[in-house]
UniProtKB/Swiss-Prot annotation:
A Pfam family recorded for this sequence: tRNA_bind
Family per similarity comment: Belongs to the class-I aminoacyl-tRNA synthetase family. MetG type 1 subfamily.
The keyword Iron-sulfur is annotated on this UniProt entry: no
Known role: Is required not only for elongation of protein synthesis but also for the initiation of all mRNA translation through initiator tRNA(fMet) aminoacylation.
Cofactor(s) the protein needs: Zn(2+)
A GO MF label: methionine-tRNA ligase activity
The entry's keywords: Aminoacyl-tRNA synthetase, ATP-binding, Cytoplasm, Ligase, Metal-binding, Nucleotide-binding, Protein biosynthesis, RNA-binding, tRNA-binding, Zinc
Reactions mediated catalytically: tRNA(Met) + L-methionine + ATP = L-methionyl-tRNA(Met) + AMP + diphosphate
Protein name: Methionine--tRNA ligase
């Protein structure tokens, strides 16, 4: 029976490029989806960019552009990289969409109606230099449980989770400053009220790998579940919570809802009903994720889905991390390789195959050993699989395929009989097992060609029928391998289809040989991977890292150069020129609108004692008058008074910015006194 499957990979964060570590997941998912489609199942591969949060806001601010510009540019780059590796999504969206906003409202209302949301004041880390509350990812410190230094803001490598305020010696990664603790109102989901449901789902649904279920039962479900902090105060880039103005949904609330929102976009474009994919017992929901985001997808997410009436995950496929040469990916070693850089040097099919040889259904880290990579790809793909076609391809273009399938010693039928076992391995996520089984078939097929010696038959006119038979067997065995490898190597499957004049579209094509047809001109199927190409790739990665480090050293906060371009530095002046300008600290005693002026506010500034100045400042679009009263500002106190039709202006308030709403009055630290000169 045809199955219907909704498949997702974790949404890549729109704050940086795709690298080979990310690709473990997207290739794993793509392989599984392609297998399901090859088997005739109806399968949607849904993804989107994860676009909200403080990181996006901070980066956009530093680059002098809007968050929208940043996430749109990043989305284009992500999709370009994915396409380069043959990763085919049925739909790729963005969490910053109206569909996602609507669904967030809907699910939020469900949580409210279920009495799962509470509000309370919490202490939160605040960066006094960056002037923002710090998300977990922007804090590092010593784990309060095991004492390991330089750990993330919300969890340690030891498996312990905590609040950022519990960290020992916390440091802001935005500015390097020591954060201070400030109180803010936050909204929480009371997960403990869902404890019984989550415990039952984790233990008995079959959705989780055994090691994952045991981890959750031992680390989380054995105790009372902590409330989930679901909101963040302004400033924050995201969706404002409709019934809590000034507060925004935490990125981990709206990000997984993006799975549903992207499906909604696909449904709208294809005339389908979202309920058939997210509220139907006839549809399976499969999530592929990394082990670092396990508890978001296995506790918070099922709780949200259950409460809002959406389908629960049928399976959460969790994978480990990528190491290179037995170590963590390293920029200094050149092993932190961007997808774009890899594509400049190496055939992406090589990485697709290598990852497939390493992936299993278990939560295990993968190791990309450079020497092993070269050996495995060249030996398996070029030396075995492609070798079958390349040794007879040119001859077959002349002879065509035999009218009936020749005697091959049972090779084709034996390979056909392995189809179910290979399919079962794919289905279970045991890609490494599937690759081993396929290579065993390649090992059995190659001796047939070696013993037949078609290159010698080609020299003898009387042996052309024999040559045609050998070509027929060899190309059909090659085609079987291409079908079995099609989920992993779609480009090779396409070339096989082009050669034999029949595209590979179904797993069942592995069960019946092709006969009595012509063969197209043989084209080179795959090149060997060269060690020097890998070395060049890693050298380029080192250079990229060095350039980024150099840029960070001269501009550690990633400040944009656009303001300087808009208003270049003025000509040099002497200290005597500067001393002519009398800058003074002043306090705003009163502020009011000027009805006749669109841009001006009328300010009365106190310089201490009875000394005051009346100033007209072009800051109306940026400031409410009442919010200025009492502030300390810096004014030019010796500017010649200027008579205006609204009154006399006796100075100037200093401010930065291009104008309009983007005007920022210069302040001064507390302790300074009105009347003091600014030197």
């Amino acid at each position: 029976m045809t199955r219907r499957l909704l498949v997702t990979a974790a949404l890549p964060y729109a704050n940086g490029p795709i690298h080979i570590g990310h690709l473990v997941e997207y290739l794993q998912t793509d392989i599984w989806v392609r297998f399901q489609k090859l088997r005739g199942n109806r399968c949607l591969y849904i993804c989107a960019d994860d676009t909200h949060g403080t990181a996006i806001m901070i980066r956009a601010r530093g680059e002098g552009r809007s968050e929208i510009e940043l996430i749109e540019e990043t989305s284009e780059a992500h999709q370009r990289d994915f396409a380069g590796f043959g990763i085919e999504f049925d739909h790729y969206g963005s969490t910053n969409s109206e569909e996602n906003r609507t669904l967030c409202h809907q699910i939020w209302k469900s949580l409210r109606d279920a009495d799962l949301v509470v509000e309370r004041s919490v202490e939160q880390l605040y960066d006094p230099e960056a002037e923002t509350f710090l998300a977990d990812r922007f804090v590092r410190g010593t784990c309060p449980k095991c004492g390991t230094p330089n750990q993330a803001g919300d969890n340690c490598n030891c498996g312990h989770t905590y609040s950022p305020t519990e960290l020992i010696d916390p440091v802001s990664t935005l500015s390097g400053a020591t954060p201070i603790i400030k109180e803010a109102e936050h909204l929480f989901v009371e997960l403990e009220k869902l404890h019984d449901f989550l415990s039952e789902w984790v233990s008995n649904s079959g959705a989780l790998q055994p090691e994952t279920a045991n981890y959750l039962k031992g680390h989380f479900l054995a105790d009372e579940l902590r409330d989930w902090d679901i909101s963040r105060p302004a400033p924050y880039f995201g969706f404002e919570i409709p019934d809590a103005p000034g507060n925004y949904w935490y990125v981990w609330f709206d990000a997984p809802i993006g799975y549903i929102a992207s499906t909604q976009q696909w449904c709208d474009a294809n005339g389908e009903d979202l309920a058939d994919w997210w509220k139907s017992d006839d549809c399976e929901v499969h999530h592929f994720i990394g082990k670092d985001i396990t508890y978001f997808h296995t506790l918070f997410w099922p709780g949200m889905l259950k409460t809002a009436g959406f389908s629960l995950p049928t399976k959460v496929h969790i994978h480990g991390f990528l190491n290179v040469n037995g170590k963590k990916m390293s920029k200094s070693d050149g092993t932190f390789v961007k997808a774009e850089t890899f594509l400049k040097h190496i055939d992406p099919s090589a990485l697709r195959y290598f990852y497939a040889t390493k992936l299993s259904s278990r939560v295990e880290d993968l190791d990309l050993g450079v020497d092993e990579f070269v050996e495995k790809v060249n030996s398996d793909l070029v030396g075995k699989v492609v070798n079958l076609a390349s040794r007879v391809g040119k001859f077959a273009s002349r002879t065509g395929l035999a009218p009936s399938y020749p005697e091959d010693g049972g090779l084709f039928q034996a390979a056909a009989a392995k189809g179910d076992e290979i399919a079962s391995a794919y289905e279970d996520g045991e890609f490494s097992k599937a690759m081993r089984l396929i290579m065993e078939l390649a090992d059995a097929a190659n001796p047939f060609v070696e013993h037949a010696k078609p290159w010698e038959m080609n020299k003898a006119p009387e042996r052309q029928d024999e040559l045609r038979d050998v070509c027929t067997v060899a190309l059909n065995l090659f085609r079987q391998l291409a079908v079995y490898l099609a989920p992993v190597l779609p480009e090779l499957a396409k070339k096989c289809g082009d050669l034999l004049g029949e595209p590979i579209t179904s797993w069942e094509q592995s069960q019946t040989p092709l006969v009595d047809r012509g063969v197209n001109k043989f084209q080179r199927m795959m090149d060997r991977v060269k060690t020097e190409d890998l070395e060049a790739m890693m050298e380029e990665s080192k250079d990229e890292a060095a350039q980024e480090t150099g840029a960070a050293a001269t501009n550690p906060f990633n400040d944009s150069d656009q303001p300087l371009k808009d208003e270049p530095l003025a000509d040099e002046i002497t200290i005597d020129d500067f001393m002519k300008v009398d800058l003074r600290v002043a306090r705003v005693l009163s502020a009011e609108h000027v009805p006749e002026a669109n841009k001006l506010l009328k300010l009365t500034l106190g310089l201490g004692g009875d000394e005051t100045r009346q100033v007209f400042a072009g800051i109306k679009a940026a400031y409410d008058p009442e919010k200025l009263v009492g502030r300390l500002v810096v004014m030019v106190a010796n500017l010649k008074p200027r008579k205006m039709r609204f009154g006399l202006s006796e100075g100037m308030v200093t401010a930065a910015g291009p104008g309009g709403e983007e005007v920022f009055v210069l302040g001064i630290d507390e302790g300074a006194l009105p009347g003091q000169r600014v030197h």
